[in-house]
Design a protein with these regions (language model features):
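Non-catalytic, well-ordered alpha-helical scaffold segments
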Residues: 22, 201-203, 237
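Short coil/turn segments at secondary-structure junctions
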Residues: 52-56, 226-227, 231
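Short helix-start
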Residues: 151
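Long, compositionally biased charged/polar accessory segments in the mid-to-C-terminal portions
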Residues: 232-236, 240
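Small-residue-enriched alpha-helical segments and adjacent helix-cap loops
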Residues: 1-135, 141, 145, 155-159, ...
Length: 240
């Protein structure tokens, strides 16, 4: 019986007799398949589709995934750790891999410069959705109150606006985003995709220790590296 196993992405062979497991293991190895990934070992890791097709991707997830897994491949085959260990790679804070609460080491895409904006798309969005949705679903839901709705004439300019992202939604009103207060949660980008976008100085945040248990619930990972650039070969090598 073969089962494709959910979050781990493994093919599981269930119901084998104990005295035949090693024979099956050896035979599949000879065919070129990797085996292992269960018990107190490095588990099968996962990365989102990311850079292959998603505009929100902040680094090359599959490359980072391969770099890390190739380094620790031997630890996947046989249980050799005190407890299981999982790596997961998400390209942005939407965290499609659930890495923040389902991985011992999570690599989540982020950026450290100002957000980008597109006035044409912002005006189209506003014309379609209106003021109520802009206020209730964008401005009011910013977790750090980094977004303000202003009249165009009140927008800050010059050196005082170096840390701001401003975009007109109409001839009279505009959004002003204080990038110093932004926590890169992706909510406004998700709601106004295209009109707002992540910055160009991208990389990843690395977290340790996320897990999910029935007794306690989600325990989010702890940030150990707030920002790591992931652009050059040296950057990806630094992951390991």
């Amino acid at each position: 019986l073969i089962a494709f196993h959910g979050q781990s992405g493994d093919i599981m062979f269930q119901g084998a007799k104990t005295n035949k497991v090693q024979d099956a293991f050896d035979a599949l190895n000879e065919l070129g398949f990797d085996l292992g990934g269960a018990g107190p070992a490095v588990r099968t890791s996962m990365s989102c589709v990311g850079a292959a097709r998603c505009e929100q991707s902040c680094y090359d997830e599959s490359r980072a995934h391969r770099q890390v897994i190739n380094t620790f491949l031997d630890d996947i085959h046989r249980p050799a750790l005190p407890y299981k260990f999982k790596f997961k790679f998400s390209g942005c804070a939407n965290d499609c891999m659930n890495s923040i609460q389902r991985a011992d080491m999570a690599v989540i895409g982020t950026w450290r410069d100002n957000m980008r904006s597109d006035e044409g798309l912002a005006r189209k969005w506003f014309a379609k959705h209106g003021m109520n949705e802009l206020v209730n679903d964008v401005v009011a839901r910013c977790p750090t109150k980094a977004i303000m709705l202003k009249e165009v004439k009140e927008l800050r300019t010059g050196d005082a606006a170096a840390h701001l992202t401003s975009v007109k939604v109409s001839d009279t009103h505009a959004l002003e985003i204080d990038n110093k207060d932004c926590v890169r949660c992706m909510h406004c980008v998700n709601v106004m995709t295209g009109a707002l976008a992540h910055g160009t100085d991208t990389g990843a945040t690395i977290l340790i220790g996320g897990k999910r248990t029935l007794k306690i619930g989600d325990l989010m990972g702890t940030v150990v590296v707030p920002f790591m650039p992931l652009k050059s070969d040296e950057d990806y090598e630094a992951l390991v």
